[in-house]
């Protein structure tokens, strides 16, 4: 999937205001609804053979290109709840281009669910001929708007569009990385399976509410699942996620709380890149707070070959793909504004048992492709014909929600040091460093089956922190590296981990 097209297609121009003429309830009959119904539907669906979703569209919409799809725009004045002075509005996406799967969407009000009917006059079609009024195409997805930046303007805060992908932003941010409902066989030789959301139920918010609830039904060849998202936009936009998975077959590679991002190049990885920009990425590292209480930082890179990393754990406390660089000078891109992309932190609720945080880094020669994936992989397979429940919280925002007293690695620079060595230059910042004794501060660096030399720590007046540098003698095979700042044998920084590849 072309990533730039995906972003543009799900972020068409937005218009505010309170004009009348919003989406009408049409003729669908309401039915009783509560949170248990979606799980029952998913359970029943899993007991039946998988049926591929409908991609049938009218001939003039079946094979449109990106430009024609982008011209199909939802009319903002027809938004759900427009003119009702509620804290949220919903707009819908037309099917076509990459997004051919039919998605049904319901509004839930007073314990009753009413299907939101497809109506051609909800959209403008550019040069395309609209479908006839009797055609029921359903939708491709939806987005939610709220006055997150200004009290009188409903900005887009999240979008559900394409397979089981969804994205969100916090105040002042732009779309970047994506989350997914479920990943199956990601990075496996047998090929990845892409589950998809087939039905949504959106609860009508009360006046003055600071959250909105969305229920979702997911289907796939190997499993079904039910979700309840409680979405709270703000300085950090938070999703409370309750999910139940119903496998049709034993799932030995089910990725939980999966996310995807893009890392093209940065100061640690500029091989074969000729670009005026210092860095191009939506995320620059994977942060892990493991069950042992360790805080890990793994800078991302764009490898020559697929790289898979595993961080084994018991009951993880959190992990996420982060965008730590927040300065325009780090990117110098007036159009993309990578410094305004959100970080995404997963906070497991309850014990998730044994497993691993997985990181996949996929080679890419263009920034339009998502080439980074991360998720939690349970150690034990999820057996078929059972229910497997998980609860977690997604934090979309500038940083992790967990306060830390440890110093952090803010930048990783890598370069050649002669013909036989590679130099690593790590900048470390944080309040912890302001009270250190320089005579007792040292860098602790280890390498698996390789030699490290010239470990140096020194103040960095430009950042107010410290700089740790070292040299790795070149090897023929990949080398796993680990570094931290120590004082009196106590770690005062998080743990930096990295895989160097020849």
Across the structure, where does each feature detected by a protein language model lie?
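N-terminal secretory signal peptides and thylakoid transit peptides that target proteins
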Residues: 1-14
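Terminal accessory/anchoring regions of large secretory-pathway or extracellular enzymes
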Residues: 29-66, 73-75, 93, 330-502
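Solvent-exposed N-terminal domain segments of exported/luminal and surface proteins
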Residues: 50-188
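Extended, loop-rich substrate-binding clefts of extracytoplasmic carbohydrate-active enzymes
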Residues: 176-232, 353-358, 369
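Acidic, contiguous internal or C-terminal segments within carbohydrate-active enzymes
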Residues: 216-265
């Amino acid at each position: 999937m072309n990533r730039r097209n995906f972003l543009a297609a799900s972020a068409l121009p937005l218009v505010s205001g309170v004009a009348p003429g919003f989406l009408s309830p049409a003729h669908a009959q309401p039915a009783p609804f509560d949170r248990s119904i979606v799980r029952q539907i998913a359970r029943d669906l899993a007991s039946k053979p998988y049926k591929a979703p409908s991609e049938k569209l009218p001939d003039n919409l079946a094979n449109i290109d990106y430009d024609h799809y982008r011209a199909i725009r939802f009319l903002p004045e027809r938004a759900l709840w427009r003119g009702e002075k509620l804290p949220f509005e919903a707009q819908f996406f037309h099917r076509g281009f990459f997004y051919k799967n039919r998605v049904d969407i319901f509004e839930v009000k007073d314990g009753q669910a009413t299907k939101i009917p497809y109506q051609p006059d909800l959209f403008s079609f550019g040069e395309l001929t609209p479908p006839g009024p009797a055609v029921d195409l359903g939708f491709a997805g939806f987005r939610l708007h709220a006055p997150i930046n200004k009290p009188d303007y409903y900005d887009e805060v999240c979008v559900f569009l394409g397979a089981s992908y969804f994205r969100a932003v916090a105040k002042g941010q732009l779309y970047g990385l994506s989350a997914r409902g479920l990943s199956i066989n990601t990075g496996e030789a047998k090929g990845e399976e892409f589950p998809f959301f087939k039905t949504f139920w959106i609860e009508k918010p009360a006046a003055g509410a600071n959250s909105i609830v969305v229920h979702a039904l997911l289907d796939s060849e190997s499993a079904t699942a039910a979700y309840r998202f409680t979405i709270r936009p703000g300085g950090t936009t938070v999703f409370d996620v309750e999910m139940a998975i119903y496998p049709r077959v034993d799932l030995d590679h089910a990725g939980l709380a999966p996310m995807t991002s893009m890392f093209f190049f940065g100061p640690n990885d500029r091989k074969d890149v000729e670009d005026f920009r210092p860095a191009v990425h939506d995320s620059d590292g994977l942060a892990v707070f493991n069950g042992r209480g360790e805080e890990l930082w793994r800078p991302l890179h764009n490898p020559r070959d697929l790289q898979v990393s595993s961080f084994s754990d018991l009951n993880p406390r959190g992990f996420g793909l982060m965008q730590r660089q927040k300065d325009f000078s780090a990117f110098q891109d007036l159009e993309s504004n990578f410094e305004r992309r959100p970080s995404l932190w997963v906070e497991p609720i309850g014990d998730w048992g044994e497993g691993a945080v997985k990181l996949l880094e996929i080679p890419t020669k263009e920034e339009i492709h998502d080439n980074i994936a991360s998720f939690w992989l349970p150690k034990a397979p999820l057996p078929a014909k059972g229910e497997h429940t998980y609860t977690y919280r997604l934090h979309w925002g500038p940083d992790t929600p967990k306060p830390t007293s440890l110093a952090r690695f803010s930048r990783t620079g890598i370069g050649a040091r002669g013909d036989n060595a590679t130099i690593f230059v790590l900048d470390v910042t944080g309040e912890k460093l302001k009270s250190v004794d320089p005579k007792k501060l040292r860098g602790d660096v280890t390498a698996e089956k390789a030699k490290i030399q010239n470990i140096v720590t020194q103040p960095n007046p430009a950042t107010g922190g410290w700089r740790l540098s070292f040299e790795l003698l070149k090897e023929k095979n990949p080398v796993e590296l680990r570094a931290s700042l120590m004082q009196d044998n106590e770690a005062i920084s998080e743990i930096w981990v990295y895989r160097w590849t020849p």
